[in-house]
């Protein structure tokens, strides 16, 4: 079969493993904290109350007052030299160490955050671009909970529904510590 001109090379047969943590704001700024809190607290798996009432409470009260208090707490733990939250830093390190452990195999290991950046959507797109046909999704929560593991699954499937790509998927819902 003749290769079509101007067609990009296609890489097949790879497996992408995506380790996913809860999330963190991009910085300790009021705006970034507010953005993170809005995404997190708008998740119906996290806050299981009447969505109409909750959105009023969230947008009128919580998102106007809570970011200042939360920013103060983040500033205490923020890794200033790296300009990164500890959760993001250690999640990156986990992904690097896992990647080094499996470097000889046809496995690409990456990380994402359920809320904030890097997003599940951006990382799934990246794994697709690298030619992954299989996805292993590992939420970094040792026990299953709808507010943690299930919301990761929701976001993975929402992302895939919008793509013209359907890899084989293995989700690890819990693991022993």
Regions found by a protein language model. Name each.
Residues 1-177:
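Active-site-proximal alpha-helix that buttresses catalytic centers in soluble enzyme cores
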């Amino acid at each position: 079969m003749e290769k079509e001109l101007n067609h990009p090379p296609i890489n097949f047969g790879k497996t992408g493993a995506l380790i996913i943590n809860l999330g963190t704001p991009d910085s300790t700024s009021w705006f970034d904290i507010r953005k993170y809190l809005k995404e997190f607290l708008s998740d119906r798996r996290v806050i299981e109350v009447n969505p109409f009432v909750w959105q009023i409470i969230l947008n009128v009260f919580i998102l106007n007052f809570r970011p200042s208090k939360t920013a103060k707490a983040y500033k205490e733990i923020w890794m200033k030299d790296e300009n990164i939250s500890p959760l993001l830093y250690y999640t990156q390190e986990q992904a690097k160490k896992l990647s080094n452990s499996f470097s000889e195999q046809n496995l690409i290991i990456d990380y994402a955050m359920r809320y904030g950046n890097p997003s599940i959507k951006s990382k799934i797109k990246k794994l697709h671009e690298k030619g992954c046909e299989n996805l292993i999704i590992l939420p970094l929560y040792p026990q299953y909970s709808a507010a943690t593991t299930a919301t990761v699954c929701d976001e993975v499937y929402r992302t895939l529904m919008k793509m013209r790509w359907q890899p084989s998927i293995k989700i690890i819902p819990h693991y022993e510590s």
